[in-house]
Regions:
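Glycine-rich anion-binding surface patch
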Residues: 138
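Conserved RecA-like helicase motor-core motifs
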Residues: 102-135
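RNase H-like, metal-dependent nuclease domains and their acidic two-metal-ion catalytic environment used
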Residues: 1-114, 142, 146, 150, ...
Length: 180
């Protein structure tokens, strides 16, 4: 897994972060994707997956937003896609504000949405607009599933480990043994 931006000379690439927002009883997940664009088809590597707010005291959105902004510092993503349905709206509201990092005694910047008109008047002027908010509907979910399925099976998306490695690891656990 990659833990920060890695730039290789002569290889065009950039990072995307995708965030599914959750709170009590569930986990907010940030998937780090490295994109390799070319003339005919883009390729995608999932290079890391982070859980934001690993324990109960860190599940509050203030802390999750701080963790995400720290990841943004490390990966310098071109875009950060956030699920802003339901609870995600509160998360989004904090992303458009500055965040104080108490551990490092610094202020992390506010970011803006590039695609959501409802944030245009309230996000800070001049902020970097790299947030992309998704309010999924049944149709959008269906379209995303179809596109993802096609990309995975065409080989355009690579994961942290292969399907075979994942099966071997899963089957070596007690939970995996119950799936036989």
């Amino acid at each position: 897994p990659e833990t920060h931006e890695i730039v290789r000379e002569g290889i065009e690439s950039f990072y995307l972060l995708a965030v599914d927002v959750a709170r009590i009883g569930c986990q907010t997940v940030c998937v780090v994707i490295k994109v390799f664009p070319n003339d005919t088809e883009w390729h995608f590597n999932v290079v890391n997956i982070y859980i934001l707010g690993k324990n109960d005291s860190e599940k509050v959105f203030d802390h999750q937003v701080l963790e995400l902004k720290r990841l943004m510092e490390k990966f310098h993503p071109r875009e950060v896609v956030i699920d802003i349905n339901g609870l995600g709206v509160s998360f989004a509201d904090l992303m458009i504000k500055e965040t104080f990092d108490y551990e490092r005694n610094i202020v992390l910047p506010a970011y803006g949405f590039s695609n959501r008109d409802e944030y245009e008047g309230i996000q800070p002027r001049g902020c970097e607009k790299i947030l992309y908010g998704i309010k999924a509907t049944g149709q959008i979910n269906s379209d995303m599933h179809s596109t993802l399925f096609a990309k995975v099976y065409s080989g355009a998306i690579k994961f942290l480990i292969s399907e075979q490695e994942a099966k071997v690891k899963l089957m070596s656990t007690k939970a995996g043994q119950k799936m036989k």
